């Protein structure tokens, strides 16, 4: 029987970055290849009804070993890693019995995980921690979640004395580019409720996400020879700068926390003739979320009025909504996860997700899906790390949740 660390280290060797630019499903071929490998592993450990569809969704069933009817529960994680940093040739290192000091990730490039910048790592002093070599992300988001779920399923299969109802397992592609639930067949999955294992540090239990939208701003300039440009040229670069500065300077990710929302400028492509700005818009409060969408549109209108012509076009598209609306209708799914953590000596930390998970969309598709910790920190970057004990406890948590549902 493989342990969770062995599985995790094997999974991160496979580059499964998703792509913002691709229109294929999944967005990268490597995700589909990884999905097939996971399907084979699920069959090998004894799960039933294993399927891998053409879109890369993996589903499987652990059959109930009790007579009474209890809700079928699902455990879900995503296979892709973020396109924000390379996931190719990940070279992890295990820092044994972490001593509480800065960790040199890459001596040659002077890349150091510093405790004054990432003080949360001190919570894991004395534990074994998996880190990167400074060149790539680690992939704990969310291959730690996959490793934890499969390890828990194998444990339940090997320990039939632990009673449980029907358990559904699901692995999704393209979560990191906001498409993880696009082709998820809730009816086929067959769960009454589910949990994603896509959270951060040990103890995190999340039933609130942002309301989310994206905005594309297209600016049409007019290029004229600079020597004769007076009253003729419209420099789209400068108009883009004006647009950026008309949004609140403090309502950005780097200056907000907790329940505060923001506008996040993802990218700028600009030259005199044309410019494109790509934003994401986030807020927990639905009313404030709607106001933010109107606010960014209003900036475009004001600039058009100033130039007395339509040079700015703002297109806003909703991405997902705060799953709290749906989770509150079946609050017991959170209560059971809370009790399960307490039962295995984990202090639950109820926090809002300053982001989204597949569960955000799935909850609005009829599958209430709060989020559990997967154990990692500093996702999407070279300073990502995951304590081994956190992964082990996450796998234990999955087992305990299944057990508590059987005893309801």
UniProtKB/Swiss-Prot annotation:
GO cellular component, one term: cytosol
Keyword terms: Aminopeptidase, Cytoplasm, Hydrolase, Metal-binding, Metalloprotease, Protease, Zinc
Main location as per UniProt: cytoplasm
EC number: 3.4.11.4
Cofactor entry: Zn(2+)
Domain of life: Bacteria
A biological process from GO: proteolysis
Name of the featured protein: Peptidase T
Lineage: Bacteria, Bacillati, Bacillota, Clostridia, Eubacteriales
Annotated gene: pepT
């Amino acid at each position: 029987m493989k342990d969770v660390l062995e599985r995790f280290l094997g999974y991160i060797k496979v580059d499964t970055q998703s792509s913002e630019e691709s229109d294929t499903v999944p967005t990268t071929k490597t995700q589909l290849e990884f999905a097939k490998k996971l399907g084979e592993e699920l069959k090998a450990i004894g799960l039933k009804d294993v399927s891998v569809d053409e879109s890369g969704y993996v589903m499987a069933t652990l059959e109930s070993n009790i007579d009474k009817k209890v809700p079928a529960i699902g455990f879900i994680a995503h296979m892709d890693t973020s396109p924000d940093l390379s996931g190719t040739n990940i070279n992890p290192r295990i820092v044994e019995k972490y001593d509480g000091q800065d960790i040199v990730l890459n001596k040659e490039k002077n890349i150091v995980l510093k405790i004054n910048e990432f003080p949360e790592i001190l919570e894991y002093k004395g534990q074994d921690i998996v880190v990167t070599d400074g060149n790539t992300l680690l992939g704990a988001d969310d291959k730690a979640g996959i490793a934890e779920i499969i390890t828990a399923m194998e444990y339940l299969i090997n320990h039939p004395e632990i009673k449980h109802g029907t358990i559904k397992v699901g692995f999704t592609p393209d979560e990191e580019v906001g498409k993880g639930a696009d082709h998820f067949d809730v009816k086929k999955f067959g769960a009454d409720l589910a949990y994603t294992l896509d959270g951060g540090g040990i103890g995190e239990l999340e039933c609130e996400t942002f309301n989310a939208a994206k905005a594309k701003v297209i600016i049409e300039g007019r290029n004229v020879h600079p020597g004769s440009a007076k009253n003729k040229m419209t420099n789209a670069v400068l108009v883009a700068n004006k647009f950026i500065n008309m949004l609140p300077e403090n309502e950005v990710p780097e200056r907000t926390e907790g329940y505060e929302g923001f506008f996040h400028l993802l990218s700028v492509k600009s030259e005199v003739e044309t410019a494109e700005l790509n934003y994401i818009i986030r807020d927990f409060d639905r009313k404030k979320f709607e106001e933010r969408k109107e606010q960014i549109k209003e900036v475009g209108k004001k600039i058009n009025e100033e130039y007395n012509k339509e040079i700015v076009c703002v297109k806003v598209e909703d991405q997902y909504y705060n799953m709290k609306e749906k989770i509150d209708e079946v609050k017991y799914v959170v209560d059971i996860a809370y009790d399960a953590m307490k039962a295995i000596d984990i202090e639950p930390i109820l926090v809002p997700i300053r982001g989204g998970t597949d569960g955000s969309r799935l909850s609005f598709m009829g599958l209430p899906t709060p989020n559990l910790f997967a154990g990692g920190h500093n996702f999407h970057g070279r300073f990502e790390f995951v304590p081994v004990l956190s992964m082990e406890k996450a796998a234990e948590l999955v087992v305990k949740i299944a057990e508590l549902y059987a005893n309801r």
